[in-house]
From Swiss-Prot:
Record: residues binding ATP: G66, P67, E68, S69, S70, G71, K72, T73
Species in which this protein is naturally found: Legionella pneumophila (strain Lens)
Name of the featured protein: Protein RecA
Function: Can catalyze the hydrolysis of ATP in the presence of single-stranded DNA, the ATP-dependent uptake of single-stranded DNA by duplex DNA, and the ATP-dependent hybridization of homologous single-stranded DNAs. It interacts with LexA causing its activation and leading to its autocatalytic cleavage.
GO biological process, one term: DNA recombination
InterPro entries named among the record's database cross-references: AAA+_ATPase, DNA_recomb/repair_RecA, DNA_recomb/repair_RecA_CS, P-loop_NTPase, RecA-like_C, RecA-like_N, RecA_ATP-bd, RecA_C_sf
Family, similarity comment: Belongs to the RecA family.
Gene: recA
Main location: cytoplasm
Annotated localization: Cytoplasm
Length: 348
């Protein structure tokens, strides 16, 4: 009986491969099946660690949402900068028509190499996204934002016309079409979304995101980004303190949280994160206001240490590598060995 089942299965598999191409169905225990997920760094050391794989996963849909001026676009521009550092190609679908090239450049984005589209309708934006994804030549596509993806019927209609559920239907249809192409081309697609208030909610959070529920289901990672305070020097505001919560994560354990500083005209402060995580792991010693590294004093007060790390990038890189090894690579190697044991058990 078992033998007949095996014969029937192998006949079905060969029929599927003939009809739909090699690799349509694979055994998870096969050595050819990649279990490793490629990631693109977010530009934030703490967030890379919170995501569990060292960044945002390629071949997946990611949603980043939060209130206005919380750092959503800044975070996505940092992702573009990191992607370009690795020699990748990035595209920015600017549905809000609000991209500032000079600000992007300050964050490290190679503006001359960035593909930008400012579509007229939501349908056009999503069609352009699909074509870029299917080309398999683009590594990251950012859609800014879901709220600005206005259906054609709404644009061509009168001001007071009712268009209930049009945008949600558009998103649902587009994501059904996009999701398989994204996986096949190994492209990271990031949707930036805004927050709206639900009326008449008595219990639970009244907050919701725009564009219906489809994106919540299709996204492998959802990030909730909030501004929690200001960074001041005297009366002058230099930037904002930001908190990011990993609300959903299909590639690693979710609900992790991290905080980082976004400095105006500079972006996410890598040095501040290195100081915080370095102190946490006892790589940097803190005694009163003084900070020491390898028994050498490197500055008094966090701001002076930040400037020291900025002027000594080799020290910053060394510390970052130690932090990544301690918090990320050790975890990943444990997960990898556990996963290999699991697949060996399944194969047996």
């Amino acid at each position: 009986m078992e033998e007949n089942k095996q014969k029937a299965l192998s006949a079905a598999l060969s029929q599927i491969e003939r009809q739909f191409g090699k690799g349509s169905v694979m055994r998870m225990g096969d050595s050819t099946v990649s279990r490793d997920i490629e990631a693109i760094s977010t530009g934030s050391l703490g967030l890379d660690i919170a995501l569990g794989i060292g960044g945002l996963p390629k071949g997946r849909i990611v949603e980043i949402y939060g209130p206005e001026s919380s750092g959503k676009t800044t975070l996505t521009l940092q992702v573009i900068a990191e992607c370009q550092k690795m020699g990748g190609t990035a595209a920015f679908i600017d549905a809000e028509h609000a991209l500032d090239p000079s600000y992007a450049q300050k964050l490290g984005v190679k503006v001359d190499e960035l593909l930008v589209s400012q579509p007229d309708t939501g349908e056009q934006a999503l069609e352009i996204t699909d074509m870029l994804v299917r080309s398999a030549a683009v590594d990251v596509v950012i859609i800014d934002s879901v709220a600005a993806l206005t259906p054609k019927a709404e644009i061509e209609g009168e001001m007071g016309d009712s268009h209930v559920g049009l945008q949600a239907r558009l998103m649902s249809q587009a994501l059904r079409k996009l999701t398989a192409n994204i996986k096949r081309s190994n492209t990271l697609v990031i949707f930036i979304n805004q927050i709206r208030m639900k009326i008449g909610v008595m219990f639970g959070s009244p907050e919701t995101t725009t564009g219906g529920n489809a994106l919540k289901f299709y996204a492998s990672v959802r990030l909730d980004i909030r501004r929690i305070g200001s960074i001041k020097k005297g009366e002058e505001i230099l930037g904002s303190e930001t908190r990011v919560k990993v609300v959903k994560n299909k590639v690693a354990p979710p609900f992790k949280m991290t905080e980082f500083d976004i400095l105006y005209n500079e972006g996410i402060s890598r040095e501040s994160e290195i100081i915080n995580l370095g102190v946490q792991l006892n790589l940097i010693e803190k005694s009163g206001a003084w900070y020491s590294y390898k028994q050498e004093k490197i500055g008094q007060g966090k701001e002076n240490v930040r400037l020291y790390l900025k002027e000594n990038p080799q020290v910053a890189a060394e510390l970052e590598q130690q932090i990544r090894t301690e918090l990320l690579e050790k975890k990943l190697s444990v997960l990898a060995s556990a996963s290999e044991d699991l697949f060996e058990t399944i194969d047996d």
